[in-house]
Amino acid sequence: MINKKSINRVILVGHVGNSPETRYTKDGRAISTFSLATHEFKKNLSGEDGEKTEWHNILAWGKFGEFAEQYIKKGQLVCVDGRLKTSKWLSKEGVSLSKTEIVANSITPLDWKA
């Protein structure tokens, strides 16, 4: 028998790359997007300390979108708890494209910027 239980959960702690861009649906729901940088530290092939930055696309709907618009700022350290969502589409040229985003279930500022 196949186990149908699964988990799609992401927890990221990083710095906001750009202040959220917010738009609203026809029914007034906020949709905010921003980038979040996380860093991985490890030795490179030469044995020297190295840093790799990974950029994540964050999508916040409804009350989380409103919160992001009002309180989240570029450079701020935040914790984002959410789930992965991958969208796929064809470009005008017929090329298959995809984008993976983290849909936020919560956004917690870890340092408050004025």
Show the residue positions of the predicted features.
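Single-stranded nucleic acid-binding surfaces, predominantly the OB-fold ssDNA-binding core
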Residues: M1-A114
